């Protein structure tokens, strides 16, 4: 059943088609601010007027958001620009890739300038599909003028029309040929006119008696081109360019794909005549060419309602919602969206960034548009104007389907559109997604449906593809006993009832080939649903999703997570006296970030892991030797919290598969060697915007003892709660770049959680951490614990007190479970039933393990984690 969270998630994550943008600057020109002022990302002003841009709401908002993009400690413009310079020099393509994340296709008007920019097809590397072209007709005309001027002398007397007749015929013939060639070019999907800038939108209808007037206009234009840069800015000629393009598009539509004409309307610099930028002037032209589709660009601001009227009453008119994001304030953006929807069908609205020169123009526009769309659509649903399903359909149409249909792109949104547990309105059904996956992976014969229980055990049900398809089509259901809530790793049920069941619903966004193992299978994560199909709060993935959505819905905070996998590779050994099998380090001449002789022997395995993960779209950020014997670290890319944990689980499985092929065992056991560093699973968590970082952190610290029940979820985990081993030490505190604090601050709104290891159910661990932060923001808690630059355990009590450090970390699972049991706020947020069941399971697990001797307990855990 779709919920408001489903709608919000769709708006924030659905792939988009950017139907109007421009080329990016090359890296060598990306910081030439004297030539390309960076302030123009939020203003159309030029010259002296641009100096006033820093006083606008849009500027302040953009500066704050860009600070989070660059992880700048300050939103001061000079600091932001300095951070940008570093980002451009360090990894320009990485910055672009981040800014274009979520973009399926770019439609580029690549004739804005020929200088300092990358070619249109260079942009393909950053999007899911190939870039397409929008051809600017005034640029074509200027190129023809240039050819004529350089091909021979231009008559001096512009009043002698007979002298220009031949040149006019050549111009009109060559211009028409260029337009016709572009119509036939499959890389071109549309045309654009900037007549709004040149002579205004009041394009005059065709009148054969005006031939003399047209040639006079041409004569003036080419005479000017002979002495300066060719530019068409004479009304009769500009009007003719538009009409001739429309005539050619009309004639070609019988045999060629549909190629609309985009027109700049409204918002622009002081080159435009504001009155003549009103799209109402186009009404007679639109009526004259019903066979050609018109796209009114840039929300026609400030004439959005006039454009909306045209898009409502003429079936060949579409309203583009671009450029005002991020050029105008938040309130104005929401108002423009509301005006656009007053009478315009949602199927006639298109999205574009008008991104140009700077990749950040794309990032800001997409981010602000998604936020405004979410705010407006949620309001409409809450007021009863839309159902949730209608709003989801409209959002998907605006972001993707309308442009896909209008420009005949034949794009399919990737399965990532069905992400993180939200039903989305894609034109592709779940069945189609499965069929597409099978076509792309014909060797897959089985699907492993997976879920993670409270012991962090991955439970698996395997289905032949045809049977799995029945689940996807809802022709059958996959029921699981409720006893799973209270089940230990060895299937002992320690509480609750064996009566009743819940159902696993596949999340097809996680469907992925099972790689690194000799198996014709794929894996998919699942959601837990009730008999009635409702989400269960006991489901760890749902719980994390709900907490993340509360942050977003109530405070506009977007959380992002990324994980470091620390893992020890062990080799099997046999005690010759007893025949008992055990494990020993795979390498011993080994230390942090070194490449020893033994480490080099591991390179084929390490590189196989990296390449195998990349083959399924998981691209490691780095990997290296860690401190303990046989210990390595693999750093995963960041994502939304649920997707990040999904990636973590999948990556661990791939690593285990490959290591087993090499005759080794990969273990997440927290402290395999008492004399060496332990094994963690540190998480990076960031919130955006970072303006609430202090209250968020205050909430985390206030509830941290209870959070540890989820992040350090086994007795063995507390062998790492010690000072001096870079594991977070022993006190509830935080510190900037302090690896002896349980929470290391890295940049504004970005922390590393040190008190976390591979025994944790990571969905629950992240849910608990975010829930604690949520309480701080909701209660506006002050941050009373100061930034600690030391190992708090090494400080005398008076110095700890001066820093506000008063609470020790629980040093046993029993203590952290007791803290959770007494934390009513956290229990309520995570769900009383979930917390109660979790505590039952963890106490029973602790009792079972404590009955074993140390060697047996270690072996038992290494075999399972």
UniProtKB/Swiss-Prot annotation:
Biological process terms in GO annotation: autolysis; conidium formation; positive regulation of conidium formation; positive regulation of sterigmatocystin biosynthetic process; regulation of secondary metabolite biosynthetic process; regulation of sterigmatocystin biosynthetic process; sporocarp development involved in asexual reproduction; sporulation resulting in formation of a cellular spore
PANTHER family: AMIDOHYDROLASE 2 FAMILY PROTEIN, NODULIN 6
Cellular location(s): Cytoplasm
Keywords per UniProt: Conidiation, Cytoplasm, Sporulation
Residues in GS catalytic domain copies: 540-865
Gene Ontology cellular-component annotations: cytoplasm
Primary location class: cytoplasm
The protein, known as: Protein fluG
Any one GO molecular function term: hydrolase activity
Domain GS beta-grasp span(s) in chain numbering: 442-533
Family listed: Belongs to the glutamine synthetase family.
InterPro entries with a match to the protein in the record: Amidohydro-rel, Gln_synt_N, Gln_synth/guanido_kin_cat_dom, Gln_synth_cat_dom, Metal_Hydrolase
Cited function: May function as a GSI-related enzyme in synthesizing a small diffusible factor that acts as an extracellular signal directing asexual sporulation and perhaps other aspects of colony growth. May be involved in brlA activation (an early transcriptional regulator for conidiation specific gene).
One Pfam assignment: Gln-synt_C
Gene: fluG
């Amino acid at each position: 059943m779709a919920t408001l969270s489903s709608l919000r998630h769709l708006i924030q994550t659905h792939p988009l088609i950017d139907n109007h943008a421009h080329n990016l600057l090359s890296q060598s020109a990306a910081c030439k601010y004297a030539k390309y002022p960076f302030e123009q990302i939020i203003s159309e002003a030029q010259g002296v007027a641009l100096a006033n841009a820093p006083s606008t709401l849009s500027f302040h908002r953009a500066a704050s958001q860009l600070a989070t993009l660059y992880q700048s400690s300050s939103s001061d413009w000079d600091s932001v620009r300095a951070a940008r310079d570093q980002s451009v020099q360090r990894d320009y393509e990485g910055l672009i890739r981040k800014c274009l994340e979520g973009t399926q296709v770019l439609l580029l008007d690549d004739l804005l300038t020929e200088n300092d920019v990358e070619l249109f097809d260079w942009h393909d590397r950053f999007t899911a599909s190939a870039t397409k072209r929008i051809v600017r007709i005034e640029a074509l005309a200027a190129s023809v003028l240039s050819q004529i001027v350089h091909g021979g002398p231009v008559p001096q007397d512009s009043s002698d029309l007979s002298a220009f007749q031949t040149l006019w015929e050549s111009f009109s013939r060559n211009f028409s040929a260029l337009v016709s060639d572009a119509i036939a070019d499959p890389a071109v999907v549309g045309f654009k006119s900037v007549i709004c800038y040149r002579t205004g939108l009041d394009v005059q209808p065709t009148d054969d008696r005006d031939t003399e007037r047209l040639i006079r206009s041409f004569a003036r234009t080419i005479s000017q081109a002979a002495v300066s840069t060719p530019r068409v800015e004479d009304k009769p000629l500009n009007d003719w360019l538009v009409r001739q393009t429309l005539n050619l598009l009309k004639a070609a539509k019988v045999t060629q794909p549909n190629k609309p004409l985009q027109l700049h309307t409204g918002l622009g610099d002081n080159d435009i005549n504001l009155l003549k930028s009103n799209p109402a002037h186009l009404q007679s032209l639109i009526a004259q060419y019903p066979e050609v589709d018109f796209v009114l660009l840039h929300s026609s601001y400030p004439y959005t309602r006039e454009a909306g009227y045209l898009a409502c009453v003429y079936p060949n008119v579409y309203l583009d919602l671009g450029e005002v994001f991020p050029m105008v304030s938040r309130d104005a953006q929401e108002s423009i969206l509301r005006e656009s929807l007053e009478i315009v069908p949602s199927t006639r609205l298109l999205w574009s960034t008008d991104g140009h020169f700077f990749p950040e123009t794309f990032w800001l526009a997409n981010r602000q548009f998604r936020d405004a769309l979410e705010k407006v659509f949620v309001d409409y649903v809450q007021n009863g104007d839309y159902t949730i399903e209608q709003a989801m359909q409209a959002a998907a149409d605006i972001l993707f389907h309308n442009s896909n249909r209008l420009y005949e792109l034949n794009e399919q949104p990737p399965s990532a559109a069905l992400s993180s547990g939200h039903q989305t309105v894609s034109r592709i059904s779940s069945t189609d997604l499965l069929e597409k996956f099978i076509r792309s992976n014909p060797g897959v014969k089985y699907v492993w449906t997976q879920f993670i229980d409270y012991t962090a055990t991955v439970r698996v049900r395997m289905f032949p593809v045809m049977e799995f398809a029945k689940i996807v089509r809802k022709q059958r259901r996959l029921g699981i006993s409720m006893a799973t809530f209270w089940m230990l790793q060895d299937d002992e049920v320690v509480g609750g009832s064996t009566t009743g069941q819940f159902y696993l619903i596949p999340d097809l966004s996680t469907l992925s080939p099972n790689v690194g193992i000799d198996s014709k299978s794929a894996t998919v994560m699942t959601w837990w649903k009730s008999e009635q199909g409702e989400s269960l709060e006991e489901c760890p993935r749902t719980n994390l999703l709900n907490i993340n959505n509360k942050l977003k819905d109530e405070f506009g905070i977007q959380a992002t997570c990324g994980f470091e996998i620390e893992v020890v590779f062990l080799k099997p050994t046999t005690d010759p006296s007893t025949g008992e099998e055990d494990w020993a380090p795979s390498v011993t001449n080994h230390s942090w970030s070194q490449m020893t002789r033994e480490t080099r022997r591991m390179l084929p395995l390490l590189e196989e892991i990296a390449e195998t993960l990349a083959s399924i779209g998981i691209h490691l950020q780095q990997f290296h030797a860690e401190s303990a014997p046989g210990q390595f670290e693999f750093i995963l890319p960041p994502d939304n919290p649920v997707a990040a944990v999904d990636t973590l689980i999948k990556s661990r499985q791939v690593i285990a598969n490959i290591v087993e092929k090499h005759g080794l065992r990969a273990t997440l056991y927290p402290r395999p060697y008492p004399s060496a560093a332990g094994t963690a699973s540190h998480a990076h968590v960031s919130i955006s915007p970072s303006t609430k970082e202090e209250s968020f952190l205050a909430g985390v610290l206030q509830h941290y003892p209870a959070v540890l029940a989820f992040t350090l979820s086994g007795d063995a985990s507390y062998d790492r709660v010690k000072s001096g081993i870079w594991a977070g030490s022993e006190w509830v505190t935080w510190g900037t770049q302090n690896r002896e604090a349980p929470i290391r601050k890295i940049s504004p709104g970005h922390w590393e959680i040190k008190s976390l290891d591979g025994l944790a159910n990571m969905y629950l661990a992240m849910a608990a951490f975010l829930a604690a932060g949520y309480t701080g923001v909701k209660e506006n808690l002050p941050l009373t614990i100061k930034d600690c630059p030391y190992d708090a355990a090494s400080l005398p009590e008076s110095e700890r007190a001066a820093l506000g450090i008063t609470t020790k970390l629980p040093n046993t699972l029993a203590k952290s479970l007791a803290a959770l049991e007494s934390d009513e706020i956290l229990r309520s947020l995570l769900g009383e039933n979930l917390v109660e069941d979790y505590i039952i399971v963890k106490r029973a697990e602790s009792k079972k393990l404590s009955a074993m001797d140390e060697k047996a307990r270690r072996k038992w855990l290494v075999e399972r984690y």
